[in-house]
Structures are given as structure tokens and as C-alpha cells.
Amino acid sequence: RNIKQHLDLIAGLPGEDYESFRRSFNDVHSIRPEEIQLGFLKLLKGSSMREEAEKYGMVYSPYPPYEIIKTDKVSYKEMIRLKKVEEMVDKYYNSQKFNNTLKFFYEKYETPFDFFYDLGNFFEARGYFNRNIGNTEYYKVFLDFNMEILKGDESYLKDIIKYDYLSFNKRRGMPDFIKSNIDKQLELQIKDELRERYSFKDYQIEKFDIDMSEYLNTGKIIKKECFYLVGNNCEIIKI
């Protein structure tokens, strides 16, 4: 599809509680729009919503943009939870740079909302909301989260993270935590076979321990040694 879908969800609307917002998020997510924008109701001066604030138990910031803090249906603590989900969705989902890795984690949760909530709690526990973290750290978070929270095997996950990383970042700066070693003799053999078709000034050979093509197409993880050419402009070609 050529038209990008951008869908908005507003927290704090009259009559909506935490659970109904969770359901709304999962319904919107199931459409797989390119961007999900989570916003929080703002009670602007002169608006009809501001005039009815007391009716719905709405408490809002006294400072512009007068954002909602709590309602009679959503407590302050629940609003903070939604803020954490918003941060994770904006960074990881809306960037479209982590799609394959996110798919890995969705399979481990009842809903995508629940995953983003847990990831937000992990960010908070690590203090990541209070400081700037580097580009590669955003990828490493997945490994740490998988190990500490889900107690999961990281061997397959590393390959999926690596594929996402190489799709948007140059191989030269690839972090050690997703690097894999390829047998030098085998590397020379592959280069000899492909030398007439590809310049190895522009491409490097990268080894994966799962069939990434199968995972991309079906979501199935099949253990199989595969090799890909990774171009200087983030082009990835299966060989």
C-alpha cells in the first residue's frame, strides 16, 4: 500500500477506563498502521470538555497545554502506565526500525499492549527515561529484556535483532553483541563464487543461524545456517 496510515488514540476521554483503552490500542495495532500516535486529552481554555471536567472527575495540569492527569475512570497511576506505553510505541513501533524484533516478542505476550507496558517498566527500572541512550543501546535493550524479564534463549533473537540493525545501520558499526563469526575458508569460497556479480568493496558476508527469509515471511524460526550479503547502503541479499 502506498498511503501511510497514521492512527491516533487519545487517553482520558469521558467514560473510557484503562482496560477499554488497552482494548482500543490492540484493535488499532491489529490493523498494522505505520504509526500509532498515543495522545493525552488536553482541556484547552474555552473548550466544552473543560467546562464538563468536573462532571467526569477530570483533573488536568494548570499549565499549558492543560493535559489530563486523571479522570473518574483512569487513576493517576494508570495514566502514568499509559505514558510508558506511549514512549515505547513511539520509539520502537513508530520508527519502523524494529519490526521483526517486535514480532518475536508479540508471540510471547497475550497482546502487544502488554508487551509495550512491560518494556516500559524495564526502561524505567534501568533509568533509561532519565537519560539519553545511544542508537545501539536501543537494540541491546531487547537482549537484556529477554534475559532478565522473560528468561528466554537469546541465540535466535540475536539474529533477528541483527537483521533489523543491518536494515537501517551500516555494518561497519555493528555492535559486538550481535556479531557472528564466519569461517574464513568458507568466506573466501563464497566470495570466489560471487565475485563476478558483486563487488566486495560494497558488500560484506554475514552469517545467520536461522533462516531469516522464512522468519520474515511466516514468523517461523527454523534453525539453518544462512548467509547474506550486506551492502554499504543497508541492502541485504540472501545468497
Language-model segments: residues:
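Radical SAM enzyme core and accessory elements
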Residues: 87-239
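A structural motif corresponding to the C-terminal lobe/cap of the Radical SAM core domain
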Residues: 1-115
